[in-house]
Amino acid sequence: DAVAEGATLTVYAGGDIVTVDDAQPGVEALAVKDGRILAVGPRADIEKAHKGAATRRVDLGGKTLLPGFIDAHGHYINSLLVANQAKLYAPPAGPGKDVDSIIAALQAFAAERKIPAGQMIMAYGYDESVMPGGRHLNRDDLDKAFPDNPVRVDHVSMHGGVLNSRAQEYYGISAATETPPGGVIVRKPGTNEPYGLIMETAFLPVFGKSEPMTPEQEIEWSRAGQMLYAEAGVTTAHEGATHIAPFQTMQRATEAGANIIDVVAFPFITDLEKL
């Protein structure tokens, strides 16, 4: 139905509504006002009790309505960056089924964003475990497609990534770079040149060199990052091991009214007194 002007009460019906209440696990209809659930029950009863010109009616069309999900373990602050990167998830979530598909997605992203020569191209979601025939993404693949740009393709775990030559130079990684304890640097066969994934402790210097956001980007990217959660039905995000800088970013975004979901932050023990 059309949304009534100034409507603050919404009735959902026409699909499966899951309550997560053992006494009444499923209902036909649900009424919401100002972000709070007023009533659940049979469709006829709910629509009769909440009728009027100010009521918005939503027909679920046979789809399922679920309560908002709560992220119990995550790193919300990373979503601000991910929202502004090429998405290379493996199917069905994304296009990253093989190297050619990954390169095509990167090229489309760079063209859409009009990224100039010399500017970093960043992506997220690469998963080497799904690459057919063990053919993994490597430095040469990225160099061939992007000879004039540094390219950083972060792993789906966020614990590593693949860099092209220009990105390796930017982050100070070379054949002379030793693999630290607990780290992985995949090297070109027969050489010491970094070639594929850089993971765990070897990736920390890369992860820690992200460009700071401008005040405008903090607001814009906070909304974009939170939309990634909202689109997946997550209404509470979690930021684990929160250091002072990301905490301040979240605080400024909150003060600017940028939040569309709840965010729970757990301060890192070494920064607790500063916060």
Predicted segments — roles?
Residues 4-13, 18, 22-275:
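Divalent metal-binding segments
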